[in-house]
């Protein structure tokens, strides 16, 4: 090797199988002469069809051996490759064909959606006389259900996108093997967060292609749960399921009404959205879960979901209407119990009770989340308030709506002035200098108009820069709750995670 370039015997002449074998051996890869012959035939096919099909941009012989064949074969020295193994987005057949040549006992699935390349793969498999090789000439998505024990890919698609793509085919305990460059920490982190509980990071191996400066990283995820096809079969036996394909379906119409406070009040049901909140609700409140709502049948309920829960398989367009936040993940239909009424005559228990007049459901959810985070004893929803189980409120609360003690209160105008209530208004006194009572109500103002004059006169404020007129009402309430929680006068109440 000189100046990073491998020199092989007879390099002034046209290279042949012996020169290919020499480079492979120097990289720690030893193949029998018959295997070298197959790899040489494959190399010749690449060279022959490359002008027509643009199979590779690498043309120098030594670089082709190093960056294509050695790169394809090194993973078999780093991890035990499972069988059947699918090469996803294989292009001209890498790493799948070199791996198959080196490990003839392995069953290989070559997946390539581009038809001309798929045709090349079929021809190459025939010319090389490779057995137990299947060419899949279409795009692989979550509905692809041919079972495999492993998936390997050199494609540039993100780890998370690929894990979603192979949901239907990779078996439980199967390996998803990613041949990456060195800078892939962000996509690994995103995938671990997104697929928590479904996959674990099994191996993360940094290496370099021998005799080059090309850094590589073999990132291997192991599947913890069953593939979609098994989950579907199990879920269909465990859960009653209904297909809903028309917007005129009565059940769909009822569910669509849950996008409004009125519908929630009337039906005493609500929709939970977002993968994290949905799975936490399933885990913590299984008895309240009524139905799993998903687009079609490709996202079945998870293992361990309560058996009484139904599975509604929505037509994609109908699901999109319900998925108001565009999560593209299943929704959860839950029952909402009666919210107990608070009578001002009973006053406030020890600690802070948050009085909520907000008409914006996002503000309602945000203040409930803050109340839970800072240990408020209860949230009293005044008559003006939006419903706490409105989809926007549920989402903004981070699930705190399900955990916080909620009460229904009177209209703002009917609040007795003799109660120990701390109103919040921009013109009030500095609340950070106030000594909080042992039991009191915190009253932020309505969005826009704020508080009535009788409450403004005795109000407290969050000190802010003079250049800023005011804070968002839910933000002001959160800061006031923080000030109370740090004041030393807080009656300890178990706060929920923020």
Swiss-Prot record:
EC class name: transferase
Keywords assigned: Cytoplasm, Methyltransferase, rRNA processing, S-adenosyl-L-methionine, Transferase
Region (Methyltransferase TrmH family): 231-498
Presence of keyword Transmembrane helix: no
Domain of life from the UniProt record: Bacteria
Known EC number: 2.1.1.170
Reaction catalyzed: guanosine(527) in 16S rRNA + S-adenosyl-L-methionine = N(7)-methylguanosine(527) in 16S rRNA + S-adenosyl-L-homocysteine
Pfam family, one: GidB
Methyltransferase G: annotated segments: 1-230
Single GO term (MF): rRNA (guanine-N7-)-methyltransferase activity
Ligand binding (S-adenosyl-L-methionine): 89, 94, 154
UniProt xrefs under InterPro entries: Alpha/beta_knot_MTases, rRNA_ssu_MeTfrase_G, SAM-dependent_MTases_sf, SpoU_MeTrfase, tRNA_m1G_MTases_N
Compartments reported by the entry: Cytoplasm
Cellular component terms per the entry's GO annotation: cytosol
NCBIfam families according to UniProt: rsmG_gidB
Function: Specifically methylates the N7 position of guanine in position 527 of 16S rRNA.
Family named by the database record: In the N-terminal section; belongs to the methyltransferase superfamily. RNA methyltransferase RsmG family.
Designated name of the protein: Ribosomal RNA small subunit methyltransferase G 2
Organism field: Syntrophobacter fumaroxidans (strain DSM 10017 / MPOB)
Species classification: Bacteria, Pseudomonadati, Thermodesulfobacteriota, Syntrophobacteria, Syntrophobacterales
């Amino acid at each position: 090797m000189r100046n990073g370039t491998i020199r092989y015997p007879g390099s002034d002449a046209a290279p042949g199988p012996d020169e290919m074998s020499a480079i492979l051996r120097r990289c720690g890869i030893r193949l029998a002469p018959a295997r070298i012959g197959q790899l040489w035939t494959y190399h010749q096919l690449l060279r022959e069809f490359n002008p027509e099909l643009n199979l590779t941009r690498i043309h120098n012989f030594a670089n082709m051996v190093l960056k294509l064949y050695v790169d394809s074969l090194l993973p078999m020295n780093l991890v035990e490759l499972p069988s059947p193994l699918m090469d996803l987005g294989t292009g001209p057949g890498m790493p799948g064909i070199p791996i198959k040549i080196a490990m003839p006992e392995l069953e290989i699935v070559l997946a390539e959606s581009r038809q001309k390349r798929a045709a090349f793969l079929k021809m190459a498999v025939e010319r090389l006389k490779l057995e137990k090789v299947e060419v899949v000439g279409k795009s692989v998505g979550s509905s692809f259900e041919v079972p495999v024990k492993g998936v390997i890919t050199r494609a540039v698609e993100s780890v998370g996108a690929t894990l979603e793509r192979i949901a239907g085919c990779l078996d439980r305990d199967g390996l998803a093997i990613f041949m990456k460059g060195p800078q892939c920490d962000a996509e690994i982190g995103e995938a671990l967060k997104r697929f928590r509980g479904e996959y674990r990071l099994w191996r993360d191996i940094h290496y370099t292609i021998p005799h080059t400066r090309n850094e590589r990283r073999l990132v291997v995820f192991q599947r913890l749960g069953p593939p979609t096809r098994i989950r579907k079969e199990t879920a269909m036996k465990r859960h009653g399921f209904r297909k809903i394909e028309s917007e005129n379906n009565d059940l769909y119409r009822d569910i669509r009404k849950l996008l409004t406070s009125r519908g929630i009040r009337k039906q005493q049901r609500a929709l939970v959205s977002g993968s994290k909140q949905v799975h936490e609700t399933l885990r913590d409140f299984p008895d309240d879960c009524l139905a799993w709502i998903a687009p079609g049948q490709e996202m079945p309920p998870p293992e361990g979901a309560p058996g009484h829960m139904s599975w509604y398989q929505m037509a994609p367009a109908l699901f999109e209407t319900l998925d108001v936040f565009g999560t593209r993940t299943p929704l959860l239909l839950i029952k909402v119990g009666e919210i107990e009424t608070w009578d001002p005559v009973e006053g406030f228990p020890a600690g802070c009770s948050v009085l909520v007049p907000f008409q914006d459901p996002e503000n309602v959810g945000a203040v409930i989340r803050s109340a839970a985070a800072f240990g408020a004893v209860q949230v009293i929803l005044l008559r003006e308030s939006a419903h706490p189980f409105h989809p926007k409120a549920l989402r903004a609360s981070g699930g705190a709506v399900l955990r916080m003690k909620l009460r229904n209160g009177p209209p703002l105008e009917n609040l007795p002035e003799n109660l120990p209530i701390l109103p919040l208004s921009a013109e009030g006194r500095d609340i950070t200098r106030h000594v909080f009572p042992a039991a009191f109500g915190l009253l932020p103002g309505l969005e826009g108009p704020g508080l009535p004059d009788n409450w403004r006169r005795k109000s407290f404020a969050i000190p802010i820069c003079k250049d800023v007129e005011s804070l968002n009402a839910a933000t002001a309430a959160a800061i006031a709750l923080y000030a109370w929680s740090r004041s030393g006068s807080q009656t300890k109440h178990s706060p929920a995670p923020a």
